[in-house]
């Protein structure tokens, strides 16, 4: 199914009362056989399993990395799109770091978002910047 873009699900007040609902509108449908989706999902799972940013990360995440070069005088843009958990997705994300050198850096941000969402690490560690492995996966060239 293809839906209209919506960055928000809903807006509520501090008591949980609905202020505005952003239920996405169905725009079109696509018929893609399940076995083809299975191949795509398996590939996206392998991307994450073989990405340095997700080493020793036991939560099932699927995604795709990418870099986009603008000019040779500036670092490439780092990109990561993904969803979690892999087998029953609850969240989807897209991370773009302008001039971020590498997709691994964008994937590391996604890992921190997932860690925060699913309480996989102390939230104070994310806020203070100590949640990742000391920057060992950060790439600068």
Q: Which sequence ranges carry the predicted segments?
A:
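Short, highly charged C-terminal tails/helix-capping segments
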Residues: 124-141
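Active-site beta-strand/loop architecture of penicillin-binding DD-peptidases
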Residues: 1-29, 35, 41-124
């Amino acid at each position: 199914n293809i839906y209209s873009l919506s960055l928000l699900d809903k807006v509520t007040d501090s008591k949980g009362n609905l202020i505005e609902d952003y239920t996405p509108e169905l725009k079109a449908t696509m018929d893609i056989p399940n076995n083809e989706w299975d191949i795509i999902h398996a590939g996206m799972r392998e991307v994450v399993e073989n990405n340095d940013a997700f080493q020793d990360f036991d939560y099932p995440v699927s995604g795709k990395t990418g870099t986009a070069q603008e000019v040779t005088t500036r670092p490439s843009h780092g990109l990561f799109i993904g969803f979690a958990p892999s087998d029953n997705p609850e969240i989807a994300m897209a991370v773009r770091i302008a001039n971020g050198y590498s997709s691994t850096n964008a994937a590391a941000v996604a890992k921190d978002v997932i860690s925060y969402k699913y309480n996989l690490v102390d939230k104070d560690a994310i806020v203070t910047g100590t949640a990742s492995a000391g920057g060992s996966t950060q790439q600068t060239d």
